[in-house]
Amino acid sequence: MEQITITAKVQIVATDTDKVLLNKTMSVYCDACNYVSDYVFRTHDLKQFSLNKILYSTLREKFSLKSQMAQSVFKTVIARYKTILENQNEWIKPSFKKPQYDLVWNRDYSLTQNCFSVNTLNGRVKLPYFAEGMSKYFNHSIYRFGTAKLVNKHGKYYLHIPVTYEVEESNISDICNVVGIDRGINFVVATYDSKHKSGFVSGKAIKQKRANYSRLRKELQMRHTPSSRRRLKAIGQRENRWMQDINHQVSKALATGNPKHTLFVLEDLTGIRNVTERVKTKDRYVSVSWSFYDLEQKLIYKAKQNQSSVIKVDPRHTSQCCPACGHTEKSNRNKKIHLFTCKNCGYTSNDDRIGAMNLYRMGINYLADSQVPNTVVTE
């Protein structure tokens, strides 16, 4: 069995009195995080044991935090610093600006009688919730809750709950279908599978919408006003949410639209940013900021849910190699009109489809090298 963790976002319903208690708790928790962050930045001490020994009493007395809340503050700050060190490889002090509150399951929050019981500085409050689309995760014989995060977005309160559950691990010997997936801008994905069927998800409308976002961003950047900066930030967040939703839809369609025990083959796009930064300036925004990685991560965990697997392969020549005769030549591909024409045998097709076909073939070779029985239809 293999464990999968997803985040369930559950909206909770709070009365005006509850909101006051929640806001106060979130604000104090945030202040405590900044206090601990200052100390960690000065000392570079990331050991919870020593932080607890030095700062625990202060958090209890100065911020009136309960025991578990104080421990959660240490964990929140330590996790933020570790993320920064992994990504930046240097000590940068994080600032906790937005009120937040991390809640430990069965200590700071629990689920009873169709309500979440949430701990605050002034005792527990019981909060009803909207269960649409989330109720299946509340079966604790299957799903386990982790440390949740309480957030306030535009006056609405949400619990972001990590939910862990087990699925049957995909065994390579069970593979019955291979899908090559070429990711790009003209087509978000082009696919080719074991039934020799091709599929495309057009990126035209997405590209146009992102171009509109880019133009609006440039206009706002020229104004240099506080309101324009606020709107710039809001637009960036809106665009990210929209693109993540697109990737969610595409990855879900790929994972559920294919049978269980499918092997998805992707190009390993590590270092793609360095490549795309050499494109024309007018095309650079779309190329560099395109969220290939987000789509990849969503497909990986959705594939696991369907007892399928994802592998990444060397992307070199996937759009230059003829799937019919194997002839590889750069001039086989005409990027301007997205057409592939083999200089050796004359085979012609869309260049993104060619990429998907070659990725499919690499998946077949991967299975052959792994000595998997003939469970996949090949050409």
What positions do the PLM features span?
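Nucleic-acid substrate recognition interfaces
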Residues: 1-379
